[in-house]
Regions:
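Alpha-helical scaffold domains
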Residues: 1-160
Length: 160
């Protein structure tokens, strides 16, 4: 994961870090790298396009041009290594889930990640597009999350 952190720090904007730290007082400043959301979304998309985990059933072509091949291969390891330390790691995690094309895979990764979401911005960062095709199936999970006594699953249910 060291290479992943190096890549994230390469995207850092220190002025944005200062600004963003004031928006999230519940996150310690040293846990914020300072990466603008569009930049982090683009990076997530690049990683997703190169990872086998994000290929649809039609077996799309695996492309990993803009980031190192090794980084694309480490995506699954990153998603399975929880909790993350940095706020942007959590956002990257959510952005990667949003790129998944298989409903069951996206749902499994989201459910595994929910207990580790510790801020509103990660929770509200988006919904996997594949969920729109499975609204009835997803509704059962939404009800379960709404019934949770923890704020993050409830917040995610409301975001969906």
């Amino acid at each position: 994961m060291l290479a992943e952190l190096e890549n994230l720090f390469a995207l850092q904007d220190k002025n944005y870090r200062e600004f963003h730290a004031r928006l999230m007082p519940n996150i310690e400043k040293e846990r914020i790298i300072g990466i603008r959301v569009p930049v982090l979304r683009k990076y997530a998309k690049e990683l997703a396009h190169g990872s086998r985990l994000f290929l649809s059933v039609q077996k799309e072509k695996r492309v990993c041009n803009t980031v190192k091949e090794n980084d694309c291969d480490n995506v699954e390891k990153f998603l399975n290594t929880l909790p993350h330390y940095y706020y942007e790691e959590n956002n990257l995690h959510m952005f990667l889930i949003m790129q998944m094309k298989d409903y069951d895979t996206a749902l499994a990764y989201l459910e595994a990640f929910l207990p580790y979401i510790d801020n509103w911005a990660t929770c509200d960062s988006g919904v996997p597009a594949v969920f729109k095709k499975h609204k009835n199936e997803l509704l059962l999970n939404v009800y379960k999350w709404l019934d949770s006594d923890k704020p993050t699953p409830s917040g995610m249910a409301l975001a969906l």
